[in-house]
Amino acid sequence: MAAQTPKTIELAFEELSESQMRARALDFNNLMQRRRTVRDFSSREVPREVINACFSTAGSAPSGANRQPWHFALISDPTIKRKIREAAEVEEKEFYSRRAPQDWLDALAPLGTDSEKPFLEDAPFLIVVFAQKFIVDAEGDKQKNYYVTESASIATGLLIAALHNAGLATLTHTPSPMKFLNTILGRPSTEKPLMLIVCGNPAKQARY
């Protein structure tokens, strides 16, 4: 079978001088070095368009076969946030009391974490990253995605960087298992919850 002609478009690329490259690299490094994980959030509202712009940045991530196998679910409804917190705390109580090996609990001890997750309700936004195993095309045919976890993880990293660049604090949360997120958010079984990102402004008393 003859090879298909690649569908490409002309690259628009901005070439920088060495001094510009150094300046940009240092400025971005200085910005990202100030990123911190936050567990105490203010309920202060965040403009939705800021989050949407960060989603757009995340969508520029490379992906296997350019399939972009991810879905970002944005949650602000207090009722849904409450359901997520309740379900997450059920799993976390199991984790801390039965599932976690002692060395993992020892590693967590200096952070002071436990099964209580008030930040899941306090923060204005929760973002659930779903990795999509398949896509359904315009004809209704199911097509397999490739390098799904790797692709969705790269997009998640860009999202966290974009949120920090926008002046927002984040927390990555991974209760295990996370299938309850599919149920609460009505996502199909072909999508696997990869991460829950808590997003907003830090509380005044926040520490890291």
Predicted regions and their residues:
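Generic N-terminal amphipathic, Lys/Arg-enriched alpha-helix
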Residues: K7-E14, D27-R44
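A glycine-rich helix N-cap at a beta->alpha junction
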Residues: E92-A100, L185-Y208
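Glycine-rich phosphate/pyrophosphate-binding beta-alpha loops
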Residues: G59-N66
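Glycine/small-residue-rich phosphate/adenosyl-binding loop
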Residues: A2, Q68, L74-A152
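Small-aliphatic-rich amphipathic alpha-helix that forms the alpha element of a beta-alpha
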Residues: R35, C54-G59, I127, K133-I184
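C-terminal helix-cap and adjacent tail motif
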Residues: A2-R24, D114, M195-Y208
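Conserved hydrophobic/aromatic beta-strand scaffold that supports enzyme active sites
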Residues: L31, L126-V128, L196-V198
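Conserved, non-catalytic sequence blocks in retroelement Pol enzymes and Pol-derived host proteins
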Residues: P47
